[in-house]
């Protein structure tokens, strides 16, 4: 059964009956048949008498459809139907269309065409219509046409229109056939002669078509003439008066009979004329509502085109209706103009949109200056946006700072990482990048297009506006990054308008500076690409320079602090490097790493590739000395490290812990000697490596920086050596003070204090050889000289009236010390000793002196050999003196 149903569905439709089978156009008929579709959408075609009736079809069932006959012509016609399921169908019946003839007295909505009902009113069908668009010469129009302006100048008060009274053949030929040849013109003459003959034939055909009316009219006139000739007596002419009266009465009755019909005709004609006017001039009638719709859609160019067209057609009309319509349209256009002004001034839009709005406003009001209004409003909006943005981000920053403080107080270490200060700088730069190019393009467009007498003054005003915007932007960024760098004049001008941003940690501040420097450079580069002058971007250049200096200073301060913190990492273990027995600890390596890392971080600040024409920091003389001093401070920061080690400038974090031994923090000659070795290594080796790194990072005047740093480090080295010598010399002070000679030695020998001074020198020599062999001679010479000088000063204070035994012992001790310490005794101290000894000649026992010296050489042989062994190496200065 399903197969039969499917087969039935695929059969073509067949029309077997219609109800009714005839009728006028618009008659609703019922179509019956088989397989007339499965539903409404299945029927895809329905033609009744050749007219598409699918639009009026209502599907009822596969065997019934209701439809309405369209505007078909009279006569029988087929019903053609097609479906998706069955395809094209067939019809066994036909529908006949007839046209109902309206009588002369029947009411009708339209005037009845009487050409078919009244004899002699046949329509003229055989007369061809005149082709208005045909060429008068019968030639094809030329593709090249002369300009109307030139023709108007050559043929004033003439026209090329064939229907005009001032028609000029020359104009017509030049306009339509300027490139015609002689042969073409000859053909044109033949065409015009043939056209003239055709016109005569056409007139003859017109008379033939109306021959019945003409003959009927002539016959009627002839019959009337004959009747008049027959009326010979006066009575007949008197009857004519009655006839005239009867004719008038019949005319009056006829008019009364057809009054309603004629009135309806007049009303129909008036309605038809009104509809014709509405259809013909519907553009002006619907223009008001169309303007409103176009305003909602933003189709401004459509509004302007329609308004321009209406203005050209109806601006000077005398028709009251059209004048009223134009008044309403003008009011709508005034609203439209105000809307465009508001959009142009109140809302910042893209440059393309601004240009369109300015163009439209200029078309509506040529005397206005919308470009200048847009520039001034754009400037006010942009400056206000900058200050509003600062307020907005300041509130966020304060809220973030408050939340962080609350978390810290509640011992919650989850601190918000949002950096509103950096977000403010980034957003401000993005605003300038998106809006300043549009402002500049707008200003250039105004300058190139305006012919105002105030153009020069307004150009200066525009430059001042642009400078003010960039100045405010740079000051806002500077206030956020380096508030102390704001000029006093700016602070005085703007007062409290600048925000007081919450304090941020040093590492976040450096990060902000680094990112802000990058975004500022990008801003300058983009503005220069958009043809901004260097004068305009100069405030941003100064901002960039200040940020670079601040960033460089912060990185140097950070590097100095990191070098100072190396005091935690020193272990006082030395390595001997070369034959010169130069020594160092791990500290110089740590120091070099920190310095190089700091220099690497300053690479961005020193770079000159951020934007075209970026100046080097060293190029400005007022910055050069400051930057050189910064790098010198960085390199010589090792002094701070040693100062903290020697408890000279020890911060709180290096304070002695309760369980720590006190001796670990005390300054000793050992630490001083090791520190001197590290300083010498830094001066000799590390400074050269640091200089190469500075050159790689873009630092200028490296030689000057190295020279100043070397001088300061050398002075620091000398100071530490002097401190070491002072500490070594202080070891002799109690020994010298004990030389009172109240008790003399029991045997022939030098005094105990002299022996201890010799042994002290040996110990100092050993310490120097162990920790700073290159300083042994320098330190021991100065120490021995200081000790002997102090001893001589001490002897000079003794009582001069001493006994010969005491004098002899003094000479023995002094001579023994001179002999034992001769390696390090300078010529000056020897002269002083000889002078002092010469003053005692004759007061001491020379024989006992020689015996005591002999005994000293025996008893202190090892100590003397140690001192003499070092003296044997004096020949090679490079192995016993420092290279610094």
Swiss-Prot record:
Span of domain IPT/TIG? 13-98
- What role does it play? Component of the exocyst complex involved in the docking of exocytic vesicles with fusion sites on the plasma membrane.
Organism, per UniProt? Caenorhabditis elegans
User: What PANTHER family would the database entry show?
Assistant: EXOCYST COMPLEX COMPONENT 2, EXOCYST COMPLEX COMPONENT SEC5
Q: What is this protein called?
A: Exocyst complex component 2
Region annotated Disordered, chain positions: 1-27
Instruction: State the family it belongs to.
Output: Belongs to the SEC5 family.
Instruction: Pull one GO CC term from this UniProt entry.
Output: exocyst
What residue spans carry the Basic and acidic residues bias annotation?
A: 1-11
What interactions and quaternary structure are annotated?
Answer: The exocyst complex is composed of sec-3/exoc1, sec-5/exoc2, sec-6/exoc3, sec-8/exoc4, sec-10/exoc5, sec-15/exoc6, exo-70/exoc7 and exo-84/exoc8.
Query: Which stretches are annotated as coiled coil?
Result: 178-206, 846-874
Keyword Heme listed: no
What keywords appear on the UniProt entry?
Answer: Coiled coil, Exocytosis, Protein transport, Transport
Example GO BP: protein transport
Alphabetized Gene3D superfamilies for the sequence:
Immunoglobulins
Gene from which the chain derives: sec-5
InterPro entries, A to Z: EXOC2/Sec5 (IPR029175), EXOC2/Sec5_N_dom (IPR039481), Ig-like_fold (IPR013783), Ig_E-set (IPR014756), IPT_dom (IPR002909)
